[in-house]
């Protein structure tokens, strides 16, 4: 599809409908363990997954569509259509001058962690498959402007690799997983252990990126103070997420994963790019000081590995773009983060003009759409 606006957003979220899993899974087999929306005693509605109410102060995250950006829906009747209906989403994309949208979940967790936390592996696998099929059957089927990505069951490396193959075979263009699978589900190996190598090998073979959305690894971020109200907590959470992405890039490099799997492409959306120069400079410094080439067999500088295999995303920041040549203009993607409160919607064009005012045309096109088109193999 030819570009109309010259913008691809690589991090937007869909809202799963309340009956997604209940209409696709056996109530006789799974009962109330099926993910579903349940009215609470106070009249609000919340997602309940495997019998556990999902933590959070809302049913959905749609702040970009609220009048003050701070309020979130408490019942399904308050959820805007553009977050769950592809046709309404396309209208929102047109109004905000967005050509393509790479999709992430919401109720399932930004990286599928809410589904990944399910202890029963068979239930976890079935829930992941239902979500992945829905994305293809409803969103991808609505037109080529939606770029589908699959969540994977993390309770078993074998199951994760199998679902990755099945989902990509159906048309998914990326894979999503939590940044700390072992803390999401005790049955999962630590991300940096070689038990995950069969998955990395499958991802290389499938030739799709693996994506670690910011916020899916809370253990590597500062805790939110219990003294904060909901609005302040949301602001703090958005700022702290860069620390999580920096730690994940650090770990993916120093663990040797990206040295062993040289074709693996990793995306770190949702945390901006300002932190990247510090992270790369610190990694290179420690690589030299700790003699990691000699002692650990990490024969290339970490920054070289990053420039070969990692992507980061920008949306709100101007300062980070001034360091684009150190980060690598070919390693930066643009995102809207629709429909979350931190999204550029409905002012994406204005913010792009402001943030990219001193970026040359070639680099601007790289970041706004060419890199994403290459990564997701889009015919544009």
Residue ranges of model-derived segments:
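Short, solvent-exposed turn/loop segments enriched in Gly/Ser/Thr/Pro and often Arg
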Residues: 10, 40-41, 104-110, 150-155, ...
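Mid-to-C-terminal alpha-helical segments outside catalytic/metal-binding sites
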Residues: 2-8, 17-72, 77-80, 84-100, ...
């Amino acid at each position: 599809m030819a570009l109309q606006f010259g913008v691809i957003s690589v991090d937007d979220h869909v809202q799963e409908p309340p009956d997604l899993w209940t209409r696709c899974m056996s109530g006789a087999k799974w009962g109330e363990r099926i993910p579903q929306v349940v009215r609470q005693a106070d009249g609000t509605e919340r997602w309940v997954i495997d019998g556990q109410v999902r933590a959070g102060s809302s049913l959905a995250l749609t702040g970009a569509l609220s009048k003050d950006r701070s309020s979130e829906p408490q019942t399904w009747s308050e959820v805007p259509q553009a977050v769950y209906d592809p046709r309404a989403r396309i209208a929102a994309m047109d109004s905000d001058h967005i050509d393509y949208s790479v999709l992430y979940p919401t109720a399932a967790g930004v990286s599928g962690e809410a589904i990944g936390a399910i202890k029963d592996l068979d239930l976890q696998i079935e829930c992941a498959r239902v979500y992945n099929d829905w994305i293809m059957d409803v969103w991808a089927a609505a037109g080529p402007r939606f770029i589908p990505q699959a969540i994977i069951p993390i309770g078993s490396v074998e199951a994760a690799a199998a679902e990755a193959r099945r989902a990509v075979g159906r048309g998914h263009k990326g894979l999503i997983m939590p940044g700390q699978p072992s803390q999401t589900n005790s049955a999962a190996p630590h991300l940096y252990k070689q038990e995950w190598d069969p998955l990395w090998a499958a991802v290389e073979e499938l030739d799709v990126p693996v994506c670690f959305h910011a916020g899916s690894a809370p253990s590597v971020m500062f805790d939110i103070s219990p003294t904060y109200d909901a609005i302040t907590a949301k602001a703090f959470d958005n700022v702290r997420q860069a620390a999580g992405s920096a730690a994940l890039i650090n770990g993916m490099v120093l663990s040797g994963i990206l040295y062993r799997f040289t074709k693996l492409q990793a995306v770190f959306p949702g945390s901006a790019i300002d932190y990247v120069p510090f992270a790369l400079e610190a990694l290179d410094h420690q690589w030299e000081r700790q003699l990691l080439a000699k002692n650990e067999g990490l024969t290339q500088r970490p920054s070289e590995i990053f420039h070969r295999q990692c992507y980061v995303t920008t949306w709100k920041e101007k300062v980070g773009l001034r360091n684009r040549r150190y980060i690598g203009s070919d390693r930066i993607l643009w995102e809207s983060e629709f429909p979350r409160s931190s999204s550029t919607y409905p002012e994406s064009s204005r913010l792009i003009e402001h943030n990219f005012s001193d970026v040359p045309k070639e680099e601007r096109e790289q970041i706004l759409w060419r890199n994403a088109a290459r990564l997701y193999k889009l015919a544009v």
